[in-house]
Amino acid sequence: RAIRDVYKRQALGLPCAAVYLLALVVFIPFRYFGSSMYGLPVDVVGRGASAPGVHQDLASFLSALLSIYSGTLLGFVDDVLDIRWRHKLPIPLLSSIPMLVVYMAGGGSTSIVVPAWPPLLRQALGCSSVHLGWLYYVFMMLLATFCTNCINILAGINGVEVGQALVIAVSVCINDVLYLNIPGVIRAAWESSSDTPSPAHILDGYHGSTDLVVRHLFSLHLLVPFIGTSLALFLWNRYPARVFVGDTYCYFAGMVLVSCGILGHYSKTLLLFFFPQIFNFVLSCPQLFGLVPCPRHRVPFVDTGSRTLYPSCVRLTEHAFPTRLILALLEQLGCVQRIYDESGQVVGTTNLTLLNALLVLRGVRVAPASKADLLASKSKTDPVLRPAPVRHTLCVSEHALWYYTMGVQALGSAMAFTVRYWLSSIIFPAT
């Protein structure tokens, strides 16, 4: 039993990515069959279906494949060589170059709309939009870096990497479908004497904007196969996991999502669906920037007696005022638990991650650190503190923690839709 639980197949995100890329390559002839895009005549789609428009769309599609392929390859290299964090951060920058070049060659917009509320902003700038130029490309490169690494940072329990990517992908697909005239297609199919009504009805979508519809169809063509392959991988990676996805899947999933956002021209909307990942990054900042010691692994600990999880901890080597202030504030918010020794002095804290924060919020507590615990955590390179859990507090299994995490991810998607379709109509009334 112990051998089956310990020795798992690693980096199984690679077969998932390989099947996905193969499916998209096979899909290319069906996507561009005939003389126009999606099999629609030129007089229906307009200039977007002409030869230059089809070539530009094909270039975008191939650049997405190249970026996803390079991200997957570099992720697999990371799994094999175990690259350090400071070296792996620039990897997505290299993978994003093909799609950014195609975005630039296609005349992609580099302007942002200035919020209409408060009115002082537009009055001060004297315009309703600001042209960022090369700064917009810097933003998109940073977005590629964030989307790939944030999935990797929010990891540590069975199924959480694939689960969060699936929730985000399904949410983005729902957002894409909102731009399509699905009722019009159904109505045309019901009223048409032909068994297969013209697909032109799909282009009567969002406020009559053909460009928006084509962009979101492009996004759907990338996301639907991704959801299918990820679901198959999830069946093997869910608790109790039979395989591990590795960094390969994290890079692969991040590049798929960021390719849809950049080439679909909704990069800012895509960022809204990463609310939990943004929270996890902000929560981790004190450890990432050295205010609190950061061990190599911050995943929750397993209580061997009950087989449940409790927050992992780190020993505090310094007690600077900013560190004490941040930890006191986070403890008041219920995100961390400070660890005390037998004399009542603060000697450690739970690690600053979303998974540990959920355990603390659910009431899982850690006992005061003993002298033996403190002696065992004197390593400066990996200052892990391992106090025992408080047995009479709430116990949370790994399976339950996965459900809590997915609930937070779904709540983040609901917040994203609220911001995108309600709050944005107040701040950007003209758009």
Predicted regions and their residues:
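"…together with the soluble PPM/PP2C metallo-phosphatase catalytic core" -> "…together
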Residues: 1-288, 416
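C-terminal membrane-associated helical module and adjoining short loops/tails
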Residues: 262-431
